[in-house]
Amino acid sequence: MEENDPKPGEAAAAVEGQRQPESSPGGGSGGGGGSSPGEADTGRRRALMLPAVLQAPGNHQHPHRITNFFIDNILRPEFGRRKDAGTCCAGAGGGRGGGAGGEGGASGAEGGGGAGGSEQLLGSGSREPRQNPPCAPGAGGPLPAAGSDSPGDGEGGSKTLSLHGGAKKGGDPGGPLDGSLKARGLGGGDLSVSSDSDSSQAGANLGAQPMLWPAWVYCTRYSDRPSSGPRSRKPKKKNPNKEDKRPRTAFTAEQLQRLKAEFQTNRYLTEQRRQSLAQELSLNESQIKIWFQNKRAKIKKATGNKNTLAVHLMAQGLYNHSTTAKEGKSDSE
């Protein structure tokens, strides 16, 4: 295909883009279709706008170091900023432009040609290791245009990521793109070696750290977690005095006489009458209420007679409690 052959102007733009500082705010989007003076001036202005720390000689990337995984690139403040703006727009432009280079989509979004944008993408690939996988679905056009950097790749859209794989072989064979390449079925011999080494390293780590618990352990009930300790601690949590929730009230003779007289007058106290009794006898309302409940339950248990409402409900089949304890609860206020 004629579109896959890199143009001389685009190759020169890619070489110059690699010489410029790689961490400009619009780095992945300014690759033009040729080496025009206006675009070169734009690149120089962007280089002048960068801090002096980012322009140190150690931060410049050389063409043979395109491995998509360098620590000096990760430590830059601009790392990962152009993931959505630069590379995804370039990939979308490649998908819209097809084999012609995607000049319509990428130039409209970022101001550069599709093929030139792919050249710049290759130059900035060592800066952002997570940029390349989002552009793989729509990289049918522009990415093969820069395929001359990776030997043995001329099949187009089916192996677009092998371009970055070939560039990665010269540097770091165990980069972060191994997972994405294996997911797309592009893993080669070196990728299988790295996967074996990764699995063996993972097994060694698991052997060296036997105290690591799986995630499901922390998602189960509290009794199944290791942090809850042995299960023999459970009986200790129980309160031995669970039955003695309320202390028994020791009424005086005067209080008992007054309560019995009030009970003879009316077995059921109103709230107002209960409050007045509590103030007169220096008792709590709950103590007076419970005494009246207990007194009614004792009388009912001794006589065995049910109140008229209970008899009426039992005749209709709506009330048939067998024990007197439950019947005593029905009389409670």
Curated annotation (Swiss-Prot):
Biased composition range(s): Low complexity: 142-151, 191-200
MF annotations from Gene Ontology: DNA-binding transcription activator activity, RNA polymerase II-specific; DNA-binding transcription factor activity, RNA polymerase II-specific; RNA polymerase II cis-regulatory region sequence-specific DNA binding; RNA polymerase II-specific DNA-binding transcription factor binding; sequence-specific double-stranded DNA binding; transcription corepressor activity
UniProt-annotated stretches for the region Disordered: 1-49, 95-206, 223-250
Record keyword Nucleus present: yes
Ranges of the DNA-binding region feature: 244-303
Cellular localization per UniProt: Nucleus
A GO CC annotation given for this chain: chromatin
Pfam families: Engrail_1_C_sig, Homeodomain
InterPro entries with a match to the protein in the record: Engrailed_Homeobox_TFs, HD, HD_engrailed, HD_metazoa, Homeobox-engrailed_C-terminal, Homeobox-engrailed_CS, Homeobox_CS, Homeodomain-like_sf
Intrachain disulfide bonds: none
Highest taxon listed in the record's lineage: Eukaryota
Compositional bias segments (type: Gly residues): 25-36, 95-117
Any one Gene Ontology BP term: hindbrain development
Keywords, comma-separated and alphabetical: Autism, Autism spectrum disorder, Developmental protein, DNA-binding, Homeobox, Nucleus
Pathology noted in the entry: Genetic variations in EN2 may be associated with susceptibility to autism.
Entry similarity comment: Belongs to the engrailed homeobox family.
Name of the featured protein: Homeobox protein engrailed-2
Organism name: Homo sapiens
Lineage of the species this protein comes from: Eukaryota, Metazoa, Chordata, Craniata, Vertebrata
